[in-house]
Swiss-Prot record:
PANTHER family: PROTEIN-L-ISOASPARTATE O-METHYLTRANSFERASE, PROTEIN-L-ISOASPARTATE(D-ASPARTATE) O-METHYLTRANSFERASE. One of its GO terms (cellular component) is cytoplasm. The keyword S-adenosyl-L-methionine applies. Its EC number is 2.1.1.77. It catalyses: [protein]-L-isoaspartate + S-adenosyl-L-methionine = [protein]-L-isoaspartate alpha-methyl ester + S-adenosyl-L-homocysteine. HAMAP family: PIMT (MF_00090). Disulfide bonds: none annotated. It is found in: Cytoplasm. It is an enzyme of class 2 (transferase). This is Protein-L-isoaspartate O-methyltransferase. Keywords: Cytoplasm, Methyltransferase, S-adenosyl-L-methionine, Transferase. One of its GO terms (molecular function) is protein-L-isoaspartate (D-aspartate) O-methyltransferase activity. It comes from Methanothermobacter thermautotrophicus (strain ATCC 29096 / DSM 1053 / JCM 10044 / NBRC 100330 / Delta H) (Methanobacterium thermoautotrophicum). One of its GO terms (biological process) is methylation.
Length: 217
């Protein structure tokens, strides 16, 4: 499937989603087929989200590339991901921040947490720690973070995530009261008490569920 992966990366470069060498290299290294269910493997390198069970999806490759480019990652950064899902996004980010960096990723659904933890370990990602918990509250134990990104949509920006950013750090999150359309917002912490935000356009993500997210029963 390496040829298919290279073709996908080339396509994303031509369409302007992959701009940097770091993101190109990361997406070329990570085997997306390892993160999708067996009956979806034939579609692993199509640019589309795919079901991974429990009502969740693996993001389309163009969205993964776009997030990685927006975050403007550097080797050695400490990053927090909310919504591990299958672990594919985490693997791409981990490739960019390298062994000197570390990614903490929080997943609320037990089955997905276990699957992702085992898969990432089997692929040798020692710079990723998978946590089972409510991602809307972040992960204060290892704060502050250089970058925080959320792979599910929140009705508002969770205060704990803002507080867990280091000064100069960035938070990327889909926000909106409509469960089928949100705005992708990039927030930068400019001082202890000040933040600035930028709206990057419309997206559609699965809902963030938890204390500071949607409350479904």
């Amino acid at each position: 499937m390496m040829d298919e992966r290279r073709r996908m990366v080339q396509d994303l470069m031509e369409r302007g989603y992959i701009k940097s060498e770091a993101v190109r290299r990361a997406m070329e290294r990570v085997p997306r087929e390892e993160f999708v269910p067996e009956d979806e493997m034939h579609r692993a390198y199509m640019d589309m989200p795919l079901p991974i069970g429990e009502g969740q999806t693996i993001s389309a490759p163009h969205m993964v590339a776009m997030i990685a480019e927006i975050l403007d990652l550097e080797p050695g950064m400490k990053v927090l991901e909310i919504g591990t899902g299958c672990g594919y996004n985490a693997a791409v980010i981990a490739e960019i921040i390298g062994p000197e960096g570390h990614l903490y990723t929080v997943e609320r659904i037990g089955i997905l947490y276990e699957r992702a933890r085992k898969k990432l370990r089997s692929l040798g990602y020692d710079n990723i720690t998978v946590i089972h918990g409510d991602g809307s509250q972040g992960f204060a134990d290892e704060a502050p973070y250089s970058r925080i990104y959320v792979t599910a949509a929140a009705p508002y920006i969770p205060d704990p995530l803002m507080k867990q950013l280091e000064i100069g750090g960035k938070l990327l999150i889909p926000v909106g009261s409509d469960k089928f359309y949100q705005e992708l917002v990039l927030i930068e912490r400019t001082s202890a008490d000040d933040y600035r935000s930028r709206n990057l356009g419309g997206v559609a993500f699965v809902p963030l569920i938890g204390k500071h997210g949607w409350k479904f029963h």
